[in-house]
């Protein structure tokens, strides 16, 4: 493992511990937003003087980063044989952190093999779960990671466990200076400067900040800060990012298409992350870096529901409740961003 943090939560006695498996089988950001819930689950058992063997079920895409968390004791890749795999695991509890018909059908197939199965109550197929809890997530009264925590609290209540308090999440690289030098060498970047990561893409269908606005913001930051601007691209995003690079040739391009671990290593070395609401924004939150996210006002994609869990976060939306991301005033917001990140720049420089 290339990262450190949460080692004390690893299960040391698999044979005599309850086996709890958690399913979050959608996108990268959704999995990262489940991390506080997974930590809370582990902590609840420890506060009761017990251990829990924690497994997760994830898509193949998010598997590499799931394997990096020492408190996750087993990672299962979702495939067409998942039901058979889980039936053979002697699992005590299965928790679905989100519900769709595919997951409900899976739960129904496991009812005779797993004593306790929990999921959010949504739509008519919720009866397929052994136990479901109405959360009304579509109302967006809480963040996604808080909804995940609420499910864990239901499990804890049913199993006479405390609702554990969450420690601040701040993952770190084992050898940050070494990894920083490796990345700097790849990008021909100055290892001693402030690094600002910019990701202009989004993994969903929600409105995004136009490329022209990113160009304006990057120019503004480069003129006002002694920094390296690193353009981040993932699968299918390189061509558009190269087009952006033509407009800001002083920037560096870092392609993380082939490795989520490389994305995490980069985020560990950033002082500031800027981008639309997407998976990399949430990966950055693992390191408690400053982050700036651009969001539409529509409820289903709002900051209220999808903000990252790190404390130092600035969310920016179009004015007057609009969903037109082109209405965001970069000249005005650029000043706000500078004001937001300035107090922490000196301490980040000292850390390096």
Model-based region annotation:
Residues 1-352:
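Catalytic machinery of carbohydrate-active enzymes
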